[in-house]
């Protein structure tokens, strides 16, 4: 199967400062990939290189087997068959919704029967048929993003690129528009690359996630694999919360840390030193005895919150603060037992 997108050893610098460093990845037809990372990691620059707005220093890019960038090739933006959607849609204020979408077909008119049929199909797909005669200033932010998506899909591009398209919307609207937009992409069978800083968004909607740091891809994997089997400590902490401790491996599949001896997930040899990471949801709290892999603690303070209970406790010389979705009623100062559900992650060489 030919990849919808293939990037090979792509690099880009600005004023001798590397921004993209040997980026390689592929995208299957119909697949939705999220690229996540801290601000300045290079994710938007990567998207702009794919679209043709920036020229890489080296590497290759191909769409459905056709080279659009290499040492000897650099197709202009209009010939790349890509849709590009940014934070605020960037609609033409003097054109109606209908004509904004028609502009995606190249002439802004939508006069032929085939063009009208395509525009009407995109209006229906994105749920904005009743808005066809309105102007951008008459639309909400969410409606404008729907129009921008319809315009991007109108010419039937090989790939859709989306640069944090929901970040300017409020939380409730963002959730609805995000779900509708993902559904529209899947209904149209389109491959898409999202740039996002929202890891929860990526975990929920991506087929695969690429984690970037300082111009490099740390790991590309399914949401489940990335969360459960991160390649390194940086990827683990970016994709989810974690409580970390220096630790040393034992021969029996455990590691010694400040909380005691705990089971770990690692193939490193005994004696290896590194960092142990526990996901917060792995902890459960019991007022009395609990199964193996338990930690004796003293409750310092419990604070009920809207969706969880915040519990501060001391285990040995270590003070922990946990947000537990449900917890037994515990008085401050009472002894309790923390149970660890499943092995902790262990990363050799990552010492704190």
From Swiss-Prot:
InterPro entries in the cross-refs: AAA+_ATPase (IPR003593), ABC_SmlMolc_Importer (IPR050093), ABC_transporter-like_ATP-bd (IPR003439), ABC_transporter-like_CS (IPR017871), ABC_transpr_FbpC (IPR015853), FbpC_C (IPR041230), FbpC_RD (IPR055223), P-loop_NTPase (IPR027417)
Binding sites annotated in the UniProt record for ATP: 37-44
Membrane topology note: Peripheral membrane protein
ABC transporter domain segment(s): 5-239
Source species, domain of life: Bacteria
CDD domains: ABC_Carb_Solutes_like
SUPFAM superfamilies per record: P-loop containing nucleoside triphosphate hydrolases
Record flagged with keyword Zinc-finger: no
Compartments, as annotated in UniProt: Cell inner membrane
Gene Ontology MF: a single term: ATP hydrolysis activity
SMART domains reported in the protein's UniProt record: AAA
Keyword match RNA-binding: no
EC number: 7.2.2.7
Quaternary structure and partners: The complex is composed of two ATP-binding proteins (FbpC), two transmembrane proteins (FbpB) and a solute-binding protein (FbpA).
Primary role: Part of the ABC transporter complex FbpABC involved in Fe(3+) ions import. Responsible for energy coupling to the transport system.
The protein, known as: Fe(3+) ions import ATP-binding protein FbpC
Organism: Neisseria gonorrhoeae (strain ATCC 700825 / FA 1090)
Name of the coding gene: fbpC
């Amino acid at each position: 199967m030919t990849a919808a997108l293939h990037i090979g050893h792509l690099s880009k610098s600005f004023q001798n400062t590397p921004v993209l460093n040997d980026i390689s990845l592929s995208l299957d037809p119909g697949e939705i990939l999220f690229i996540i990372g801290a601000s300045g990691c290079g994710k938007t620059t990567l998207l702009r290189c794919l679209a043709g707005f920036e020229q890489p220093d080296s590497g290759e890019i191909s769409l459905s087997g056709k080279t659009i960038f290499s040492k000897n090739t650099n197709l202009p933006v209009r010939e790349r068959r890509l849709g590009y959607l940014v934070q605020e849609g960037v609609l033409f204020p003097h054109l109606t919704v209908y004509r904004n979408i028609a502009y995606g077909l190249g002439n802004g008119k939508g006069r032929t029967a085939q063009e009208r049929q395509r525009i009407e199909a995109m209006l229906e797909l994105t749920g904005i048929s009743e808005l066809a005669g309105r102007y951008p200033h008459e639309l909400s932010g969410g409606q404008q993003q729907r129009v921008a998506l319809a315009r991007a899909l109108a010419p039937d591009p090989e790939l859709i690129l989306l640069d944090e398209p929901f970040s300017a919307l409020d939380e409730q609207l963002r959730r609805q528009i995000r779900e509708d937009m993902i559904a529209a992409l899947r209904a149209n069978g389109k491959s898409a690359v999202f740039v996002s800083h929202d890891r929860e968004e990526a975990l929920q909607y991506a087929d695969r996630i690429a984690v970037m740091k300082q111009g490099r891809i740390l790991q590309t994997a399914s949401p489940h694999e990335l969360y459960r089997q991160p390649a390194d400590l940086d990827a683990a902490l970016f994709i989810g919360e974690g409580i970390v401790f220096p630790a040393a491996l034992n021969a029996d599949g455990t590691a010694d840390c400040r909380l005691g001896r705990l089971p770990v997930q690692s193939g490193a040899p005994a004696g290896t030193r590194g960092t142990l990471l526990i996901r917060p949801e792995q902890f459960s709290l019991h007022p009395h005895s609990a199964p193996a892999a338990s930690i004796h603690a003293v409750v310092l303070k419990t604070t009920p919150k809207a969706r969880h209970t915040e519990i501060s406790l001391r285990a040995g010389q270590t003070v922990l603060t946990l947000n537990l979705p449900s917890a037994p009623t515990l008085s401050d100062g009472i002894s309790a037992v923390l149970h660890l559900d499943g092995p902790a992650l262990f990363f050799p060489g990552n010492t704190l």
